[in-house]
């Protein structure tokens, strides 16, 4: 099949500046391009050529300004069997007009059918023009069908994944060496490390973890909170919230390290520094990919029961799920339990790694996506007979 991926106007592909969508595309494209002719559309970046082919995958990039129209014009020059539109239902009609014979697959990585984001008319039209819809979680699926019940028959839940080759677990020789190297880099030594990875925004909850640390250090002087991320992908500029975090952390500066933005290819190494990873999402997260990453690295995981986060974590088996998500004391209890019970923490971490190996390597994701594309293609062929 001739496949096209149309990224959003937010970030370039490959994921040189991060982004969950871009990282998933990077993960599945090597597998899909082995069997199919794959073209990826994304915004341009000064570090990338406007057109190039890398490992059988074709990339076409346009400036952010007028991006969607540039893509639509380019589609007219091709004959794609399936066009996969990422997270932009509003653009479906434009792309379908540009390539009317193509089957459209829409993937939803956020709650893009909110009333403030799309009208009833545009929402219905987008659903009617798509052959298949994928969602990153049951949570996002349920949010969509609550407003547009007619979409249900088209939806497949498509969980993301990781490149396991990038995540040597902490108990392997390679993982142990990386752990030691990065602990030396940040001057951590043998201290217990609580890790946060994500955008520095109130919705992600790093402030909750600083309040948690205040309580933890009363009983654990050898504990460090490592906060990895910037205010936006690859953006380390300060805003009011980041300034607030720094001020909040000032009394605990000996126990907190801000690494700022870390390139995506280095993130697996950051995970290996940790003794406990905490996904402190305060909003109804579609499903944070850091949950997959922590389990892949073999790090004991604590996550909040917000949005889709709990869907890929088995409570008390592959991670600990916190319901009282905005209460620092709930995090203290979970973190302290894992610190005090290393055998249990290790058992849980190994369960998590095994769970990822069995279900969420990017090869698994690519196979599930390919089935959606084939079903979309065959469904349209049958309709035309």
Across the structure, where does each feature detected by a protein language model lie?
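Short His-centered aromatic/hydrophobic patch
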Residues: 85-91, 108
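Short alpha-helical donor nucleotide-sugar binding micro-motif in glycosyltransferases
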Residues: 261, 269-274
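Acidic donor-binding loop of glycosyltransferase active sites
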Residues: 272-286, 299
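N-terminal strand-loop element at the rim of the active site
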Residues: 9-15, 23-65
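Conserved donor-binding/catalytic core segment of Leloir-type glycosyltransferases
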Residues: 4-6, 134, 177-179, 183, ...
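Nucleotide-activated donor-binding/catalytic signature segment of Leloir-type glycosyltransferases, i.e.
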Residues: 229, 239-262
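Short hydrophobic beta-strand element within catalytic cores of glycosyltransferases
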Residues: 300-303, 313
């Amino acid at each position: 099949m001739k496949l096209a991926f149309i990224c959003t106007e937010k970030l370039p592909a490959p994921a040189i500046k991060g982004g969950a969508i871009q990282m998933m595309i990077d993960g599945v494209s090597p597998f899909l391009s082995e069997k199919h002719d794959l073209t990826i559309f994304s915004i341009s970046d000064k570090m990338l050529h406007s057109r190039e082919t890398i490992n059988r995958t074709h990339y076409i990039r346009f400036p952010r300004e007028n991006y969607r129209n540039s893509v639509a014009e380019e589609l007219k020059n091709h004959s794609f069997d399936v066009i996969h539109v990422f997270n932009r239902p509003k653009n479906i009609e434009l792309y379908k007009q540009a390539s009317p014979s193509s089957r459209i697959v829409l993937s939803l990585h956020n709650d893009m059918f909110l009333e403030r984001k799309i009208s009833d008319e545009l929402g219905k039209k987008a659903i009617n023009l798509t052959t298949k819809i994928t969602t990153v979680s049951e949570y996002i699926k349920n949010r969509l069908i609550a407003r547009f019940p007619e979409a249900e028959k088209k939806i497949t839940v498509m969980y993301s994944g990781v490149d396991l080759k990038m995540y040597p677990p902490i108990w392997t020789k390679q993982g142990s060496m990386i752990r030691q190297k990065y602990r030396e880099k940040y001057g951590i030594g043998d201290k217990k490390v609580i890790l946060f990875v994500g955008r520095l925004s109130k919705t992600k909850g790093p402030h909750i973890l600083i309040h948690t640390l205040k309580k933890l250090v009363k009983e654990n002087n050898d504990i460090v909170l490592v906060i990895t991320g910037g205010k936006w992908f690859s953006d380390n500029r300060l805003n009011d919230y980041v300034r607030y975090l720094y001020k909040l952390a000032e009394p605990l500066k000996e126990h907190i390290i801000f690494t700022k933005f870390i390139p995506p290819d280095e993130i697996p190494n950051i995970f290996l520094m940790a003794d406990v990873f905490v996904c402190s999402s305060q909003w109804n997260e579609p499903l944070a990919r850091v949950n997959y990453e922590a389990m892949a690295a073999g790090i004991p995981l604590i996550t909040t029961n917000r949005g889709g986060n709990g869907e890929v974590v088995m409570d008390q088996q592959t991670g600990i799920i916190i319901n009282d998500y905005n209460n620092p004391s709930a995090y203290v209890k979970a973190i302290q339990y894992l610190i005090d019970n290393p055998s249990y923490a290790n058992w849980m971490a190994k369960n998590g790694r095994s769970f990822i190996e069995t279900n969420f390597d990017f090869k698994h994701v690519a196979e599930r996506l390919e089935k959606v594309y084939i079903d979309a293609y065959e469904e349209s062929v049958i309709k035309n007979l």
